[in-house]
Amino acid sequence: MRNWKLLPVLALATIIVAVVLYVAFYFFFLDLFVDLWWFRSLDFEGYFWLRLLYRFILSGGVTLVFFSIFFFHFWIASRYLGLNPPDDVLLDADKRRRFQRFADVFMNGSIKIYTPLSLLLAIVVAIPFYEQWEQALLFFFGESSGLVDPVYGQNASFYMLSYPIYMLIQQELLYTAAILFLLVGILYWLEHVFVPNQNQEYPLGAKIHLTILMGFVVMFVIWGFILDRYSLLYVSNHEPVFFGPGFVDMRFYLPLIWLSIVTFLAVAITAGLFIFSKKHRIKWPFLVSLALFGSVLGLEKVKIIPDLMNQLIVQPNPVEAEGSFMKYNIDATLDAYDLNKIKIIDYQVSLDASQDIKDWSTKKHFENIPVWDREFLQDVYQQLQ
């Protein structure tokens, strides 16, 4: 009787499973199999699987790389560089044994925390790569276009294929380095506080490790400033005269970007010396460099200086001030449409049109001019010109 009671439940479960399988096959796998058979008939089955799996291979590879970076630094910080017992603990066998036992408990417990944390951080940091995997493929497999940017001398394919990925990679690597620096610093602090019988001074290995991580943060920030230079090429406030950077952009904003790099590097160096030096900690170099860096960033937001440059230098003689930048736009347009091989002939314009009219009268240029039709007269005149 018990088996008979289970039959309706089994029948209902079978129906539900069948419906789920049918829906999955109809909405997901039907197109997949049709495409597979089509590509297989063309002997392109390998390409089909690559096209299908590219996003998962790329996403999985990026996640694995970021997970390895996080896990490696956490593992180094907890295993080797964070423990600094004094000499009396190392010389006494009982104290050394107790210290090692507590340290082992701390390291084994911390690995259970930072392993899933590394995976979670890797997934969060790699999310933009999941969404823009097609651009990443173009970055890896794109070829040179053969056209050179007249401003910075970069290949045109750099701006279409590489520059967007560089912006994405720079942000993700900066987040990764900053998170690592913060969390590894917290891990060293926890080891220093909760593991007993340690020196008050942090070990040399921990300082070197934190300095390296801080160096990565600085490097990625500077890389971001360098990439900001290329954003000046997308300025459109000079249209319809020309597209791209003008006098103010290249003579004011570009030097500010370089000043931002120099002052931020000074902030990083003075901060590192202040944090990691044992003695003679002086605050004023760090404060001065920080104030200079903040001033440079503030100048980018102030509009009075570029407005004055525009009013006093550009507007009185725009051709003289921005002629070279207009030429950049002209050269780029000629390269884009492959017009740089055209022979250019300069015609001398005579202010006296009587001779031109006399010549035209013999060449019958006026036969088809609709002088009676006001609607078409101006268009025909423009065509003749």
Where are the regions that the model predicts?
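Soluble extracytoplasmic regions of secretory-pathway and membrane proteins
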Residues: 5-9, 15-18, 22-385
